[in-house]
Swiss-Prot record:
The keyword Ribonucleoprotein applies. One of its GO terms (molecular function) is structural constituent of ribosome. Binds to the 23S rRNA. This is Large ribosomal subunit protein uL15. PROSITE patterns: RIBOSOMAL_L15. Residues 25-37 have a biased composition (Gly residues).
Length: 150
């Protein structure tokens, strides 16, 4: 049998008939229709909204309003100060890997961010994910350049 558009049909057992509730005991879902005996969930109409606790003060109103919250995926940086870059040779291209080889960084796990603490008199080309304004100022004042990378 060839596979054509008109010969396609669902797999055996994939399509089930709609359950007709309240159509007699022999139908399997008669009498209380699978809703149990009595109570709010057995009545007609819309069910209770999510978070409704039967009139009890709900959890979202019992807990205090929190002022601050932590970010789910914060940006993490490996930081280095401009003063630490001063011990590198002039004309060096500074990256996260080159700083690890030089022994300035110990764990290059995250993206590199350059902070502006310390003095710099050496011309460097710095590749980093972020710079503070003072760090960028000091690097460019020494004749170097700052390049943003991802």
């Amino acid at each position: 049998m060839s596979l054509t558009l008109q010969s396609l049909k669902p797999q055996k057992g994939a399509r089930r008939r709609k359950m007709r509730k309240g159509r007699g005991i022999a139908a399997g879902q008669g009498a209380s229709c699978g809703f149990g005996m009595r109570g709010q969930k057995s009545r007609s109409g819309r069910p209770t909204r999510p978070g409704f606790e039967g009139g009890q003060m709900p959890l979202y109103r019992r807990v205090p309003k929190l002022k601050h919250f932590t970010l789910v995926n914060p940006k993490r940086f490996t930081v280095v100060n401009v003063g630490e870059l001063a011990e590198l040779k002039a004309g060096t291209v500074v990256t996260r890997d080159s700083l690890t080889e030089a022994g300035i960084l110990t764990s290059p796990k995250h993206a590199l961010k350059v902070l502006g603490d310390g003095e710099l008199k050496v011309k460097l080309t710095v590749h980093a994910a972020a710079f503070t304004a003072s760090a960028r100022e000091k690097i460019e004042a020494a004749g170097g350049s700052c390049e943003l990378i991802d």
